[in-house]
């Protein structure tokens, strides 16, 4: 049975809105209340996305207390040509350089392949940890669409009808995005 309240730890308002949409889509009865805690968690510097999310979730549990169902979500953007980098470091790339400069990193290479990956780490009311992951393959393109949500305007998913995430309607994006896929798995677990 799904818990009645789950705490999502994030300080990212766009991410929070998207997660609210993703959870509400399945929860027709309103049986789960999503609470937000914008805790400032340390981020493990690693290329192992599951380890990063799990470490953040353990920190959140330490701050909020065992017994509170809590989850964190970490997103990565990996370039095939760079053997998985920038990966989880994409957040720092975005803070230090423009989207245009990120695209230029791949300019010398013909392979513009990329993967968008979301990893969810969840701790249930019994203190047990669970990991869920969603991956969407795509490519890096020149920026198209609004630039107000991370790197959405430079990632074009293979099954995205030639559009970047930023050019898509939210409902369509959520059916094929890395975050949408991760939340499908998370919701299956919650409602099992």
UniProtKB/Swiss-Prot annotation:
From the UniProt annotation, give the residues forming the signal peptide: none
Q: Which UniProt keywords apply?
A: Cytoplasm, Hydrolase, Magnesium, Manganese, Metal-binding, Nucleotide metabolism, Nucleotide-binding, Nucleus
Q: How is the cofactor bound?
A: Binds 1 divalent metal cation per subunit; can use either Mg(2+) or Mn(2+).
Q: Name its cellular compartments.
A: Cytoplasm; Nucleus
Task: Give the first-level EC class, as a single word.
Answer: hydrolase
Essential cofactor(s): Mg(2+); Mn(2+)
Taxonomically, the superkingdom here is Eukaryota
Record-listed Mg(2+) binding positions: 43
Q: Which GO terms describe its biological process?
A: nucleotide metabolic process; purine deoxyribonucleoside triphosphate catabolic process; pyrimidine deoxyribonucleoside triphosphate catabolic process
Enzyme Commission number:
3.6.1.66
Q: Which CDD domains match?
A: HAM1
Annotated catalysed reactions: ITP + H2O = IMP + diphosphate + H(+); dITP + H2O = dIMP + diphosphate + H(+); XTP + H2O = XMP + diphosphate + H(+)
Could you cite one Gene Ontology molecular function of this protein?
A: UTP diphosphatase activity
Where primarily located?
cytoplasm
| Residues reported in the UniProt entry to bind ITP | 10-15, 56, 74-75, 91, 149-152, 173, 178-179
| Recorded GO CC terms | cytoplasm; nucleus
Assembly: Homodimer.
Similarity section: Belongs to the HAM1 NTPase family.
Its function, per the record, reads: Pyrophosphatase that hydrolyzes non-canonical purine nucleotides such as inosine triphosphate (ITP), deoxyinosine triphosphate (dITP) or xanthosine 5'-triphosphate (XTP) to their respective monophosphate derivatives. The enzyme does not distinguish between the deoxy- and ribose forms. Probably excludes non-canonical purines from RNA and DNA precursor pools, thus preventing their incorporation into RNA and DNA and avoiding chromosomal lesions.
**What is this protein's name?**
Inosine triphosphate pyrophosphatase
Recorded name of the encoding gene: HAM1
């Amino acid at each position: 049975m799904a818990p009645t309240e789950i705490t999502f730890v994030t300080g990212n308002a766009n991410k929070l809105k998207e997660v609210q949409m993703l959870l509400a889509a399945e929860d027709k009865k309103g049986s789960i209340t999503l609470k937000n805690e914008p805790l400032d968690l340390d981020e493990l510097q690693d290329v192992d996305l599951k380890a990063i999310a799990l470490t953040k979730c353990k920190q959140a549990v330490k701050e909020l207390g065992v017994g509170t169902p809590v989850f964190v979500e970490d997103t990565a953007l990996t370039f095939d040509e760079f053997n998985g980098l920038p990966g989880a470091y994409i957040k720092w790339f975005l803070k230090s350089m423009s989207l245009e400069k990120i695209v230029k990193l791949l300019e010398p290479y013909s392979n513009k392949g990329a993967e968008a990956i979301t990893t969810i780490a969840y701790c249930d009311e019994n203190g047990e940890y669970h990991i869920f992951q969603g991956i969407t393959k795509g490519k890096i393109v020149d920026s198209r669409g609004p630039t107000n949500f991370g790197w959405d305007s430079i990632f074009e998913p293979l099954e995205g009808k030639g559009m970047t995430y930023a050019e898509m309607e939210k409902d369509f994006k959520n059916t094929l995005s890395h975050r949408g896929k991760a939340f499908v798995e998370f919701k299956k677990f919650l409602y099992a």
